[in-house]
């Protein structure tokens, strides 16, 4: 009986300790390939899985230096007054990589108040990890339709196909002419 009472008391203490807001945050790249000089779309998702609203939520991502990335639209530092329990918010930023090479996409920082008079809670988003930013020339070489290359290939193969065809056609015309009947 004492063990059962202790278990109920411990369970009650755990549920009381978990009151308040609890945020889960993710950061993801929406592009399949990151290319120098082309738009790179980042999406931040923040989920409140707690029992109360998260207050003064601030998302801050300092992992994109201005000398390597230009901001096309959106902001890397965003603030929400509150995020209701069992709800989520999404934020999208469009960046333009200015240099090619490998880049470490690290996590962003999320700070919030779990309860109105509680301490500031600091959390981090998921980190996409290291990724390569392709040079524009390399991307075009790999993924362009190569119309000029195919046209050059066609012009170069034309003599090897056309000359035998012309020889065959001239001999066919020479020997296949029907003889006219004399009346």
From Swiss-Prot:
The keyword Nucleotide-binding does not apply. It is a single-pass type I membrane protein. Keywords: Endoplasmic reticulum, Glycoprotein, Membrane, Signal, Transmembrane, Transmembrane helix. It comes from the Eukaryota. Residues 1-17 form the signal peptide. Glycans are attached at residue 88. It is found in: Endoplasmic reticulum membrane. Residues 18-146 are lumenal. One of its GO terms (cellular component) is endoplasmic reticulum membrane. InterPro entries: TRAP_beta. Pfam families: TRAP_beta. The chain crosses the membrane at residues 147-167. Residues 168-183 are cytoplasmic. TRAP proteins are part of a complex whose function is to bind calcium to the ER membrane and thereby regulate the retention of ER resident proteins. PANTHER family: TRANSLOCON-ASSOCIATED PROTEIN SUBUNIT BETA, TRANSLOCON-ASSOCIATED PROTEIN, BETA SUBUNIT PRECURSOR TRAP-BETA SIGNAL SEQUENCE RECEPTOR BETA SUBUNIT. Heterotetramer of TRAP-alpha, TRAP-beta, TRAP-delta and TRAP-gamma. Interacts with STING1. Belongs to the TRAP-beta family. This is Translocon-associated protein subunit beta. It comes from Bos taurus. The lineage of its organism: Eukaryota, Metazoa, Chordata, Craniata, Vertebrata. The gene is SSR2.
